[in-house]
C-alpha cells in the first residue's frame, strides 16, 4: 500500500487540516469517532482508506497525521472538538509559547526545542507504513511557526527521508490583506530555506480565496472556515485522484513531480478549481466538461492572485471528479490545443496530464458548495512570478530601512542571512 503522512504546522496548517480531515472522513464514510458508518460497512470495502488512515484491531481508523504547533490554541480546539476521538492524542504536539510571527523563533530558538519530539512522532507513524510514499505538509509562509518551524521540519525530513516525495500546501501572503507586517521577511526566508528540500509547493492566498467566496458563493464576509473548506475542496481532487479512490486515470505522488516540475527549483504550480457554485445556483447551470475546464483557465478562478494570461504554461495537469467520460476530456484537451489562448513555452510539448476519479465530490453538510462534477487544474506557469515579484518588492522596501531586523537578530539569526 502507498501511504502518505500529513504534517500540519502552525495555526494555518492546523485549521486547513481540520477542514481536510472533515472532508476525508465524509468521503470514506468514517464517523467522527473513527468507526465506519453502517452504510459504509455494508458497501464494498474500499482499500483507499489505508493511504491516509491506519486501521486498529478494533476496526477504528486513525489518521496518519501529526499536528505541530508551538502554542496550544488551535490544537486544543481539535482536542475538544467533534473529531477529538478520531486523532491519536500523541500525534498532537503543542508547546507553551508561540513564534510570534518571527521566522527566527520558529526556526532557531523555540522550534529547536520541539523538532526532535515532532520527528520522533513522524518516525512512529512512518514505521507503521508498509510503503511510505511521501509527506504532505500544510503550513503558511507569513507566520513565524509556519515559516520557521515549517522550514526546519522540511530540512530534517530531507535528512531522515531523503528519497520520499514532499508536497507542500502553503498559504502565501495575500497582496492586500496582511495579518502581520513582517510577512515578506518570513516568506522569503522560508522559501529560500525550503527551495532545495521541497518537491512541489502548491500555493494558495487568502485574498484570492476570499474573492472566489464573495463572487461565486455570495458570502459577503468570508471567514477562515469558508476559505479553509474551499481550500480543502480544492486539494481534495489532488489527494483523491492520487491516492484514495480507484480511478480511471490514476496519478501517483511522484507523478506530480514528474509532470509539473520541469526544473527542480521551479516547483510552484498554480491550482485552480471549478465550478465554485452555491447549491441555489447549481441547478440552473449546465456545467459541461468543456465549460468547467475553460473556467479553470480564467484568472479570477486561480487560488493565487496572478494572471496566467501574462505568462506561459510549462506543464498542465487536469483532474476531474464525478461523472466525467474520458472521451469528453480528450475532446476538451484537443480544443484547448487548437485555441492557442493557452500559451505553452516553446521547449515543452502542449500536453495535458489528465486524471479522472468517478467518485463524485463529497460536500460538507450545510456547507457553501453544490454537489456537481468538478475540475481541478494544476499548472506550472511563468505567471506565478507576479506573486514573487510583489513579495520581493515589499521585502526590499522594509529591508532598506532595516525595519524589524533586530527581532530576528535577537533570536539568533545573522543579518547576513537576509
Curated annotation (Swiss-Prot):
Cofactor: Mg(2+)
Catalytic activity: GTP + H2O = GDP + phosphate + H(+)
UniProt-listed SUPFAM superfamilies: Tubulin C-terminal domain-like (SSF55307), Tubulin nucleotide-binding domain-like (SSF52490)
Binding-site residues, Mg(2+): 71
Highest taxon of the lineage: Eukaryota
Coiled-coil stretches: none
A Gene Ontology cellular-component term: cytoplasm
GO MF term list: GTP binding; hydrolase activity; metal ion binding; structural constituent of cytoskeleton
Compartment annotation: Cytoplasm, Cytoskeleton
Gene3D superfamilies per record: Helix hairpin bin (1.10.287.600), Tubulin/FtsZ, C-terminal domain (3.30.1330.20), Tubulin/FtsZ, GTPase domain (3.40.50.1440)
GO biological process: microtubule-based process
Keywords: Cytoplasm, Cytoskeleton, GTP-binding, Hydrolase, Magnesium, Metal-binding, Microtubule, Nucleotide-binding
Main location: cytoplasm
EC number: 3.6.5.-
UniProt-annotated catalytic positions: 255
Keyword Lipid biosynthesis: no
Subunit organization: Dimer of alpha and beta chains. A typical microtubule is a hollow water-filled tube with an outer diameter of 25 nm and an inner diameter of 15 nM. Alpha-beta heterodimers associate head-to-tail to form protofilaments running lengthwise along the microtubule wall with the beta-tubulin subunit facing the microtubule plus end conferring a structural polarity. Microtubules usually have 13 protofilaments but different protofilament numbers can be found in some organisms and specialized cells.
Name of protein: Tubulin alpha chain
UniProt lineage: Eukaryota, Fungi, Dikarya, Ascomycota, Pezizomycotina
Gene name for this UniProt entry: TUB1
Amino acid at each position: 500500500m502507498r501511504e502518505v503522512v500529513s504534517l500540519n504546522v502552525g495555526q494555518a496548517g492546523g485549521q486547513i487540516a481540520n477542514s481536510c480531515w472533515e472532508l476525508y472522513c465524509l468521503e470514506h464514510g468514517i464517523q467522527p469517532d473513527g468507526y465506519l458508518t453502517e452504510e459504509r460497512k455494508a458497501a464494498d470495502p474500499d482499500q483507499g482508506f489505508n493511504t491516509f488512515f491506519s486501521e486498529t484491531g478494533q476496526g477504528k481508523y486513525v489518521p496518519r497525521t501529526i499536528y505541530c504547533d508551538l502554542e496550544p490554541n488551535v490544537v486544543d480546539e481539535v482536542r475538544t472538538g467533534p473529531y477529538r476521538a478520531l486523532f491519536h492524542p500523541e500525534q498532537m504536539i503543542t508547546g507553551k509559547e508561540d513564534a510570534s510571527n518571527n521566522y527566527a523563533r520558529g526556526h532557531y530558538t523555540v522550534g529547536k526545542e520541539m523538532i526532535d519530539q515532532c520527528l520522533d512522532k513522524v518516525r512512529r507513524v512512518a514505521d507503521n507504513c508498509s510503503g511510505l510514499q511521501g509527506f504532505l505538509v500544510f503550513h503558511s509562509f507569513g507566520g513565524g511557526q509556519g515559516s520557521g518551524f515549517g522550514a526546519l521540519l522540511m530540512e530534517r525530513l530531507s535528512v531522515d527521508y531523503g528519497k520520499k516525495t514532499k508536497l507542500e500546501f502553503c498559504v502565501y501572503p495575500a497582496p492586500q490583506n496582511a495579518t502581520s507586517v513582517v510577512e515578506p521577511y518570513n516568506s522569503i526566508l522560508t522559501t529560500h530555506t525550503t527551495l532545495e528540500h521541497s518537491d512541489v509547493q502548491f500555493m494558495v492566498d487568502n485574498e484570492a480565496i476570499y474573492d472566489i467566496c464573495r463572487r461565486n458563493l455570495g458570502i459577503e464576509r468570508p471567514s477562515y472556515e469558508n476559505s479553509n473548506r474551499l481550500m480543502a475542496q480544492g486539494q481534495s481532487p489532488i489527494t483523491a485522484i492520487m491516492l484514495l479512490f480507484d480511478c480511471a486515470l490514476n496519478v501517483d505522488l511522484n507523478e506530480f513531480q514528474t509532470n509539473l516540475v520541469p526544473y527542480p527549483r521551479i516547483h510552484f504550480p498554480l491550482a485552480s478549481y471549478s465550478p465554485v457554485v452555491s447549491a441555489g445556483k447549481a441547478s440552473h447551470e449546465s456545467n459541461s466538461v468543456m465549460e468547467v475546464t475553460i473556467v479553470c483557465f480564467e484568472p479570477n478562478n486561480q487560488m493565487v492572485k496572478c494572471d496566467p494570461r501574462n505568462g506561459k504554461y510549462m506543464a498542465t495537469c487536469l483532474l476531474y471528479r464525478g461523472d466525467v467520460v474520458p472521451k469528453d476530456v480528450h475532446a476538451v484537451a484537443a480544443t484547448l490545443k487548437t485555441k492557442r489562448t493557452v500559451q505553452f513555452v516553446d521547449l515543452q510539448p502542449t500536453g495535458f496530464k489528465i486524471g479522472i476519479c468517478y467518485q463524485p465530490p463529497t460536500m460538507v453538510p450545510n456547507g457553501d458548495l453544490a454537489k456537481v462534477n468538478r475540475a481541478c487544474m494544476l499548472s506550472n506557469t511563468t505567471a506565478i512570478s507576479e506573486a514573487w515579484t510583489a513579495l520581493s518588492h515589499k521585502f526590499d522596501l522594509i529591508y532598506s530601512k532595516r525595519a524589524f531586523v533586530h527581532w530576528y537578530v535577537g533570536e539568533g539569526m545573522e543579518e547576513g542571512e537576509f
